[in-house]
């Protein structure tokens, strides 16, 4: 499993430590080895939460593991609804060549990603119930969308911003 790690062990702002073995993140879970499946079973993962688009899931279907519930709600819903792009090529090129265009496009998409997002809303609903844990959240590379989901989990648990930064997870103002 690529980019697999436990979110536990991080210090909260009030000095406690996030319990290990409850929240995991990774890249896509297609073509898992028997050993990977064994590890997920031994970790007692109850839910696998997938942020990938329909197209990504079609190209690289997740390995189905019995007794682990799978939920897939695309996190990039605007991208999915627009057919997988940030508007027309012409519009995108125009925006890229504006002053700080590429930075602004990327920053705005990540900044707005968790706002009113059904995917992250469902993630929060799941983690509120301890009986749903442990949970593994993932996207294709296990970085951006998964990073946002992991940051949300850690923020809810009270992990300091500096700790989130050390994990390589996006910070929002």
What is each model feature region?
Residues 1-136, 149-173:
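Cys-dependent protein tyrosine phosphatase-like superfamily
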Residues 140-141, 145-146:
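Ser/Thr-glycine-rich phosphate-binding loops at phosphate-binding pockets of nucleotides
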């Amino acid at each position: 499993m690529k980019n697999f790690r436990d979110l536990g062990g991080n210090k909260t702002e009030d000095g406690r430590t996030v319990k290990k073995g409850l929240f995991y993140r990774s890249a896509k879970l297609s073509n898992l080895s028997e050993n990977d499946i064994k590890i997920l079973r031994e970790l007692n993962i109850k839910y696998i939460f997938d942020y990938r688009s329909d197209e990504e899931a079609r190209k690289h279907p997740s390995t189905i593991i019995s007794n682990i519930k799978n939920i897939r709600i695309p996190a990039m819903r605007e991208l999915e609804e627009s057919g997988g792009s940030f508007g027309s090529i012409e519009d995108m090129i125009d925006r890229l060549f504006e002053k700080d265009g590429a930075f602004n496009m990327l920053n705005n998409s990540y900044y707005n990603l968790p706002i009113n997002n059904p995917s992250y809303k469902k993630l929060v609903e799941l983690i509120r119930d301890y009986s749903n844990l442990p949970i593994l959240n993932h996207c294709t590379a296990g970085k951006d969308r998964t990073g946002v989901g992991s940051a949300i989990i850690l923020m809810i648990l009270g992990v300091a911003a500096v700790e989130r930064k050390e994990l390589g997870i996006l910070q929002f103002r």
